[in-house]
Regions:
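Short, conserved active-site loop motifs that form the nucleotide-linked donor/cofactor pocket
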Residues: 65-67, 72, 242
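Short beta-strand segments that buttress and anchor functional surface loops
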Residues: 41-42, 86-90
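Short, hydrophobic/aromatic-rich segments at coil-to-beta transitions
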Residues: 82-86, 142-143
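Flavin (primarily FAD) binding-site architecture
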Residues: 106-119
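Core beta-strand elements of the Rossmann-like FAD/NAD(P) dinucleotide-binding domain
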Residues: 92-103
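C-terminal accessory subdomains/tails of enzymes that are appended
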Residues: 1-34, 40-50, 61-63, 108-111, ...
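A conserved short coil-to-beta-strand element within the FAD-binding core of flavoproteins
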Residues: 70-84
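A structural signal for short hydrophobic beta-strand segments in well-ordered beta-sheet cores
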Residues: 74-77, 158-159, 235
Length: 308
């Protein structure tokens, strides 16, 4: 934790603190007391990933005149002289399109590059991570997060407050349930999470209101299991003026973008080149019925999730 404080450049008031057994029990009354000696408190960040992504998209579209399109898949990419021809497919209408580009940055997440570039894509290993949502605060964590230091498969878990409810997660499985585009928590993963909550908290029954799963795209090192693979990112040149971003975390999106631009344009972009006073547009829930109708007509809103 001292190293964690050092890397974060934390002020004295923000550094981690040791907490006695007595005070730990006062903070977390449902935490099991057997083998409990003490705990420590540290500060970390929390973000709403969905709203952050939507805020970034709004900023790109409204300030930087970018174009963001949903449900439009890249089916193939061909090189033609100094240009790339990109074949697109609309999932909603079945229409096909073709566009040209001088430069490409592919950030395709869990998916390989299409067509002729599939074999030269960055090699990835998928890891599924399931979560449970508990209604309210049944574990009495009192708006604090709890870091569970050790699981049966040598990992860690978190219990976190979230919008008036509690989130428990996560797992790390190579054989995830569902598809890459629609993963879901398996019974085994749900049982795993409940079992570990009961290991640390004095509760008989765990009732969850929902579960979900996400897929991490990790850089395949050919040797380690997913839980041992570093969560870093790589930026590789697939072809001239064509790079792929793979791996990484959402919290590093700005640094990853700068590195990608440096590599693609062979220019020294620096952090100070970014105008931080031009803040990301805040995503707010201010839409009314006319906005919904406009979104359905013009922005390929096919499901309630798309609109939200």
């Amino acid at each position: 934790m001292l190293f964690y404080d050092f890397l974060g450049g934390r002020k004295k008031s923000e550094k981690h603190k040791n907490v006695s057994k007595k005070n730990t029990i006062e903070l977390f009354p449902k935490l099991k007391k057997v083998n409990l000696r003490k705990s420590f408190i540290f500060q970390d960040a929390q973000t709403d990933d969905s709203k952050l992504v939507l805020s970034l998209l709004r900023t790109a579209v409204e300030i930087n005149n970018s174009t963001a399109i949903n449900y439009l898949n890249v089916k193939n990419i061909f090189k033609k002289n100094k240009f790339y021809e990109i074949h697109l497919f609309c999932e909603l209408t079945g229409a096909e399109y073709s566009v040209s580009a001088k430069k490409i940055i592919a950030a395709s997440g869990v998916h390989n590059l299409p067509g002729d570039y599939k074999e030269v894509s960055t090699k990835l290993k998928m890891s599924g991570g399931a979560h449970l949502v508990l209604k309210g605060d049944p574990l009495e964590i009192n708006n604090n997060g709890v870091f569970l230091p050790k699981t049966e498969d040598e990992r860690v878990m978190f219990v976190l407050p979230w919008n008036g409810n509690t989130i428990v997660g996560t797992t790390d499985v190579e054989k995830f349930s569902g598809t890459k585009d629609n993963p879901h928590a398996s019974k085994e993963e749900i049982d795993y999470l409940i079992r570990h909550v009961k290991k640390y908290f004095d509760v008989e029954n765990i009732e969850y209101t929902s579960s979900w799963s996400g897929i991490r795209a990790l850089i395949d090192d050919q040797n380690n299991s997913t839980k041992k693979i570093m969560r870093g990112h790589v930026i590789e040149e697939i072809d001239k003026n064509f790079i792929q971003i793979a791996g990484g975390k959402l919290t590093g999106f700005r640094l990853i973008a700068i590195e990608a631009l440096r590599q693609l344009f062979n220019k020294r972009f620096e952090l100070q080149d970014i105008e931080y006073q031009d803040q990301i547009i805040n995503y707010q829930n201010y839409y009314n019925l006319s906005d919904l109708e406009h979104s359905i007509k013009h922005y390929c809103v096919a499901t309630p999730v798309d609109y939200l």
